[in-house]
Amino acid sequence: MRIVCISDTHDFHDEVVIPQGDILIHAGDCTGWGRMDQFKDFVDWFSGIHYKYKIFIAGNHDWCLFRSKEECVKLMNNIIYLEDESIEIEGLKIYGTPWQPEFCNWAWNLPRNSELLAEKIEKIPNDTNILITHAPPAGILDKTLEGESTGCELLLDKLNSLQQLKMHIFGHIHEDYGVKVEKNITFVNASICTRQYYPDNKPIVVEV
């Protein structure tokens, strides 16, 4: 199964060249400021990509989904939107959640290490094969240019329970784009935009 991963396109989706694959996954921040017109433009683009399966979760910039979920979901006719839920595709159990530790008072934020955030993280089923979050786990592809590790500690702890996990896809920290394999799990920071919000990074392809 060929998984193509993107994230943090921030209104620059038209400049992204999508390679062929079986499942296309966008790990959030499709918009710049979360406006409905920005989201509609993204959906038009994402819907038009010829893939058997296209999966999307929200990111902290995607205010329209946070405030007007029903209206947004109606637009996504051939897109699988995951918000604290799973889908099984050809034997792969895929779970998506947008929640992250508080970050600059954006959408989908909860206080770091809080009970509220822990409740969201604990919903991830232990038999998940592919996990999609917007923010990274602590210490994995989560460093800013200043060297600060900004990932989620609760998410890192949860990974110990996910014995069948093959991939974890996220974005959020643009400057730590890339792939890391640890304990037989492929971690993908799929941020398309750089720290300066230039869409210079390429989609990341992983065979599962």
Where do the PLM segments sit?
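Active-site-proximal beta-strand elements of phosphoester/diester hydrolases
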Residues: M1-H10, A27, G91-Q100, N129-H134, ...
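Short, Asp-centered acidic motifs that coordinate Mg2+ and/or phosphate
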Residues: I23, Y53-I55, T128-I130, K166-M167
